[in-house]
Amino acid sequence: MPKSPHKLFKANSFWKENNLILREIKHFRKIAILAVIFSFLAASFEGVSIGFLLSFLQKLTSPNDPIQTGISWVDMILAADAWPIPPIYRISLLILLSTWMRATFNYFGGVYTESAQLNLADRLHKQIFEQLQALRLSYFAQTRSGELINTITTEIERIKQGFSGLAFVLTRIMTVCVYFVVMFSISWQLSIISVLIFLLLAVGLSTLNKRVRETSFGISHANAQFTAVAVEFINGIRTIQAFGTQEFERQRFYKASTNQLNAAIKVVLAWTLVKPIAEGIATTVLISLIVISFATFTLPVASLLTFFFVLVRVIPNIQDINGTVAFLSTLQGSSENIKNILQTNNKPYLKNGKLHFQGLKRSIDLVSVDFGYTADNLVLNNITLTIERGKTTALVGASGAGKTTLADLIPRFYDPTEGQILVDGLDVQYFEINSLRRKMAVVSQDTFIFNTSIRDNIAYGTSGASEAEIREVARLANALQFIEEMPEGFDTKLGDRGVRLSGGQRQRIAIARALLRDPEILILDEATSALDSVSERLIQESIEKLSVGRTVIAIAHRLSTIAKADKVVVMEQGRIVEQGNYQELLEQRGKLWKYHQMQHESGQTNS
């Protein structure tokens, strides 16, 4: 059964190469249609103006002879008895009119084309944002942030240029079509020969365009690597300077930059080869047609001159089309990167539930939970644990024991590989994620501070917080004093990642942020580890006040921070090895007692 026109179009290589752009046009089709209409009108008036220009030149050189351009409709319009004013003036008027009409339509065509490509970039930005918002954290753990930034910025900008290129090709094709109409009206035989030769040229250049397309993937990969290295350099500048690794980073940065340069040169060498080859072949076509026409066809001199005048105007447009198609081929790597991010069949998504979480009534139960960041490497093994409402559950263990990973399962940053997490007897996956997380607050050892004011950082995620509430939580978090000492107090901008704050100050801002949310469930991941002993004591007191009536999951290396917990869970290598009351576990002289002894000897307990 023959394919439908729609399926044939989608099977076409042009669609396959540019479908990212073409499929998005439907979302701003009105703008795109207006751009096409105005571009077509501009192309039409360009063809019309050629006929008038030829007539104008003919009247200047032979004012008494009848107009013979070889274009019958032009000759008819400009016939001597058709107008009450002299021919030279009427032609001048028509040239000016067609020129200004073409300029007007070109202006509107350009405006709508630019508007369409801006809409395209806006849609792609938002689609990628929504895609990244919906993905599990495991995706980000396996993907370099620099590569994502490169896709959101550089690659989308290149695709935006691609839309402009497509619009340019479409405009030039319409212009060439108008020229061919003029040429066919003069000599259909010469026109058919011209079309066949140009088609052969297009087929030949398609081989070069394939080469350009292949090199485009190299430049996209090099751009992604360069951006990743640059982002790591900027984010890690403190560590780089502290370890004196400037020379190592210089070599790494220079290598990434050189790779980007070499990849770009390969693209340029392949791309720029297309236009001169097209120009050489087109000139050969022109000379060959002149020879053929004089040897074979008997056309009036005026018609022949008009035909070749139009053909001379066609050739640069053909060259521009071929050059732009080659440029579009350089964007295939960018297009593939964007499509790879937007693909849904190979991404880890969180399954969102439909039940609105009203709050914890009884307990959170982990039942035979296994979890691994990869399928063949489990981080948690057979975890069975009950976290009771309104009580503090402390997770203790050496680094890498799985404490943070276990806590990350509660707000569904990850889902178990096996087993279930039950909230009041219901699988946590039944609940709508945001309603669940709005009842929680997380203070982690990796505190993120936004490049905005202290006030906005504390109030982040809590709408409608009053000034008094913000000051109060800052006081409870032992942050009010240093905030008031800042140049602009609560209005002080903190810089990227809170670069103007010490580690302890950043931690206290994060604790104040959590206090303001007034959460039912509080997750403290080494929340006081970055504080000095005085601040730690003050924060510990405020956390104890905050914990009253709330469910707290506290993670700490220091035993002093979990001594008053209702339940202590000791973990080793992803397994629970002990759980119970702090004092009871010490009396058993098991794993917790060994941790206690080790830290007591190093002076880290308060006993």
UniProtKB/Swiss-Prot annotation:
It comes from the Bacteria. Pfam families: ABC_membrane, ABC_tran. Induction: By deprivation of nitrate. Its main location: membrane. GO terms for cellular component: plasma membrane. One of its GO terms (molecular function) is ATPase-coupled lipid transmembrane transporter activity. It is a multi-pass membrane protein. Keywords: ATP-binding, Cell inner membrane, Cell membrane, Heterocyst, Membrane, Nucleotide-binding, Transmembrane, Transmembrane helix. The chain crosses the membrane at residues 33-53, 77-97, 163-182, 186-208, 290-310. Residues 32-330 form the ABC transmembrane type-1 domain. Residues 364-598 form the ABC transporter domain. It is found in: Cell inner membrane. ATP binds at G397, A398, S399, G400, A401, G402, K403, T404. InterPro entries: AAA+_ATPase, ABC1_TM_dom, ABC1_TM_sf, ABC_transporter-like_ATP-bd, ABC_transporter-like_CS, P-loop_NTPase, Type_1_exporter. GO terms for biological process: heterocyst development. PANTHER family: ATP-BINDING CASSETTE SUB-FAMILY B (PTHR24221), ATP-BINDING CASSETTE SUB-FAMILY B MEMBER 6 (PTHR24221:SF654). Acts early in the process of morphological differentiation of heterocysts. NCBIfam families: HepA_fam_ABC. This is Heterocyst differentiation ATP-binding protein HepA. It comes from Nostoc sp. (strain PCC 7120 / SAG 25.82 / UTEX 2576). The lineage of its organism: Bacteria, Bacillati, Cyanobacteriota, Cyanophyceae, Nostocales.
